Amino acid sequence: MQTQIRLSRDSSIRTYGMRASAIPYRTEIERSLSSGESVVIDFAGNDVTQSFVDELIGALILKEGRQVVSRLAFENCTNDVKGIIKFVVHDRV
């Protein structure tokens, strides 16, 4: 089974920048992963900072190990977002 996490819950937010704003999403991801599901993170219409992605994905890698990345998929990422995700994954793996 697969869970989809959409970052665009609040239309007033275009850029997710603070680490604290990633925690509720990471908690939701952790809950899905612990249930044996894979997770698709949908970045549609949103920009993110490295701090946000590190708290969202980097913290998961530190906690669960590098294999957690194989259970995550990313959708609707701009080139900038893709670059940030790649940097964080390589930094934490």
Residue ranges of model-derived segments:
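Amphipathic alpha-helical interaction surfaces in cytosolic regulatory modules
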Residues: 12-38, 42-90
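Short beta-strand/loop segment at the start of cytosolic alpha/beta domains
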Residues: 1-8
